């Protein structure tokens, strides 16, 4: 059964993201004093008292939505309200009830969705609570909280889960978590939207439009995926604003909590030094990786074939040469359906377990075909080996002396494992441990 969705809405800077982070117990949304910092819908699963639901943080609703970005944020809020079973309408207890709040309340009443009025920034519960004005909204009894201090959050969550239908939190298999990383404006958000078939992530020609690592839940054929769309990573020297700084950290953290990375390149730019750095982060994090060359529709008439360009990309990213390279267009949809199929293939390799007998046969053959060079009169000897991890696969080789392993021979063994077993799109870790021969 699908988990219920709870959407947090309200005008800018009332503390929606602070409440979102408080409920999650970690900083998932960028929090800043600048109004409108959260622009996209952020999705996270919450477990409260054994009940599970999806919490959605949205951008602030602007009553004077003259700017294009404000209109886009408003559209994101509208979509979140459409898919939510419950809405948390957050207001500022310090500012009191404003005309914008009344206008938003009217919008919520028209939605016919259940609403909990959450009065935030109530930092002192020993004084009379400033709630009288908020009853005027006609949306029920206000719930006072302090998201910053964590006051009354438990009572709020009790109210949230109280109205959920029985069985709504049945456990399901874990979704595949996919980090979408790349330089600013290579089309990461457009690509996610093309896969999803709807605009969940704000798309703009302005680099850096996506500020948060935006978690988007997606289902296909009974399989769940979570796309983590990060702000584009810029060169370190360019990072001056705190929001850009946090976005770079968020991209790295997104890789840490993902299973697989889509490293997005821009066909019109070729492979840049920054692309190499970002691909390197995915490799260092030990994630399954797919290289996605976006804007391939612009290759038409250029005389460049997909196979030739893919080889060029592999040469430029030779350190991650095991990663599949897909040429797609988020605008036209060209090649986009292949992405999830490739994700499934790579995830199968990422979680693959090799029988110990097969692994020993492969590596013993590798030692026989090309024996390791002697060093200081000693030669590396393999006793036996075993797989010690998946995601990514890691193999532990028990040898007479790990100090005899050269970087070149380690690469040779990895290549032999790949030649025999594949592991397309997946880093392979070869580890060594001393064991004296009997």
Curated annotation (Swiss-Prot):
Belongs to the TRAFAC class TrmE-Era-EngA-EngB-Septin-like GTPase superfamily. EngA (Der) GTPase family. GTPase that plays an essential role in the late steps of ribosome biogenesis. GTP 1 binds at residues 10-17, 57-61, 120-123. It comes from the Bacteria. It holds the Pfam family MMR_HSR1. Residues 4-168, 176-351 form the EngA-type G domain. It comes from Desulforudis audaxviator (strain MP104C). GTP 2 binds at residues 182-189, 229-233, 294-297. Associates with the 50S ribosomal subunit. Coiled coil: none annotated. Keywords: GTP-binding, Nucleotide-binding, Repeat, Ribosome biogenesis. HAMAP family: GTPase_Der. The keyword GTP-binding applies. The keyword Nucleotide-binding applies. This is GTPase Der.
